């Protein structure tokens, strides 16, 4: 059987770093208040000339180089983002042009913070269906440009960045010891769409709008939804939390991460945390955390890695991958 194996990984961050203390002159907050409630200490903010496309292209180049490939080897460019450069054409097409890719196809996918999980799952389906051999999967965001910088409950939470992986078709044996994606589960529930959303768009207000969030409601639902979809992945494979080498969750809030790991009985030392230095980068969150753990040597070939995310909609999902 065909498996989708991670061949390469890369990331990119804006130059500017904004620390918690930098917010003290903008809104009524403090470093202590932010750290206690979120675990965030700093985040990267896009500056002039830095966009979702430029960050996504930089991460993509790094992933292709890490894979030992050329841009011409890529069949599909799949970008998860909620902050595209333009309403259309797709920012994935712009990245395709930046990389000099003239074959295959490219499109954007939008599932907010769950976007990268949705994108990996979609890429896996294209690979196993024979429509693509190598897929560039990117999560890239510039959430700083949809924030209300007078709202202290949201402006301190988010950052900008991009991460990317190259997925490649490989022969597997149908075993959980195979390298590649072993299971993926996605969910959504539109009944919660007004708990986390942007209050504008081309079809309604003809404006970009700002991010709005009912933080307590999001927190209340997050842990249960995350653990439910992860347990479905365990059930599909016969694996358990004890088999997990690394848990790479969406980096939204350390309290949510800690509560999810505890409910799943995943040891703290197996959890990859980057929310302290990146903040919530939405669809870029999981690939940025993955890239960090690969670069520092924690995630190694053969490791069983659990990815998960939850975002506006609500959308949520999980992926089990043998590295």
From Swiss-Prot:
It is found in: Cytoplasm. It is an enzyme of class 2 (transferase). The active site is at residues 113, 250, 280. Pathway: Lipid metabolism; fatty acid biosynthesis. Its EC number is 2.3.1.180. One of its GO terms (cellular component) is cytoplasm. Signal peptide: none annotated. It catalyses: malonyl-[ACP] + acetyl-CoA + H(+) = 3-oxobutanoyl-[ACP] + CO2 + CoA. It holds the Pfam family ACP_syn_III_C. GO terms for biological process: fatty acid biosynthetic process. GO terms for molecular function: 3-oxoacyl-[acyl-carrier-protein] synthase activity; beta-ketoacyl-acyl-carrier-protein synthase III activity. Its main location: cytoplasm. Keywords: Acyltransferase, Cytoplasm, Fatty acid biosynthesis, Fatty acid metabolism, Lipid biosynthesis, Lipid metabolism, Multifunctional enzyme, Transferase. Catalyzes the condensation reaction of fatty acid synthesis by the addition to an acyl acceptor of two carbons from malonyl-ACP. Catalyzes the first condensation reaction which initiates fatty acid synthesis and may therefore play a role in governing the total rate of fatty acid production. Possesses both acetoacetyl-ACP synthase and acetyl transacylase activities. Its substrate specificity determines the biosynthesis of branched-chain and/or straight-chain of fatty acids. The last Arg residue of the ACP-binding site is essential for the weak association between ACP/AcpP and FabH. This is Beta-ketoacyl-[acyl-carrier-protein] synthase III. It comes from Brucella abortus (strain 2308). The lineage of its organism: Bacteria, Pseudomonadati, Pseudomonadota, Alphaproteobacteria, Hyphomicrobiales.
């Amino acid at each position: 059987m065909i498996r989708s194996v991670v061949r390469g990984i890369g990331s990119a961050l804006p130059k500017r770093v904004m620390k918690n203390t930098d917010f003290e002159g903008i809104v009524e907050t403090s470093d202590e208040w932010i750290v206690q409630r979120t675990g965030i200490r700093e985040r990267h903010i896009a500056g002039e000339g830095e966009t979702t496309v430029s960050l996504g292209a930089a991460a993509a180049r790094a992933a292709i180089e890490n894979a030992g490939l050329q841009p011409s080897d890529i069949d599909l460019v799949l970008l998860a983002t909620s902050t595209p450069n333009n309403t259309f054409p797709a920012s994935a097409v712009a990245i395709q042009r930046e990389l000099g890719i003239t074959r295959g196809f490219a499109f954007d996918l939008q599932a907010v913070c769950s976007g990268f999980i949705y994108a990996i799952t979609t890429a896996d389906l294209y690979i196993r269906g024979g429509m693509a051999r190598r897929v560039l999967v990117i999560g890239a965001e510039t959430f700083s440009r949809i924030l209300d910088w007078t709202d202290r409950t949201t402006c301190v939470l988010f950052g900008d960045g991009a991460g990317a992986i190259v997925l490649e078709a490989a022969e597997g044996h149908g075993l959980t010891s195979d390298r590649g994606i072993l299971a993926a589960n996605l969910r959504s529930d539109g009944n919660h769409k007004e708990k986390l959303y942007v209050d504008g768009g081309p079809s309604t207000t003809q404006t970009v709008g700002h991010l709005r969030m009912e933080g307590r409601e999001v927190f209340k639902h997050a842990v249960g939804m995350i653990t439910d979809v992860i347990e479905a992945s365990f059930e599909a494979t016969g694996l358990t939390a004890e088999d997990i080498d690394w848990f790479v969750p969406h980096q939204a809030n350390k309290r949510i991460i800690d509560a999810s790991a505890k409910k799943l009985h995943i040891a703290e030392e197996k959890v990859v945390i980057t929310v302290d230095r990146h903040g919530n980068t939405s669809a870029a969150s999981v690939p940025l955390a993955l890239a960090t753990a690969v670069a520092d040597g924690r995630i190694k070939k053969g490791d069983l890695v659990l990815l998960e995310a939850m975002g506006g909609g609500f959308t949520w999902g999980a992926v089990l991958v043998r590295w």
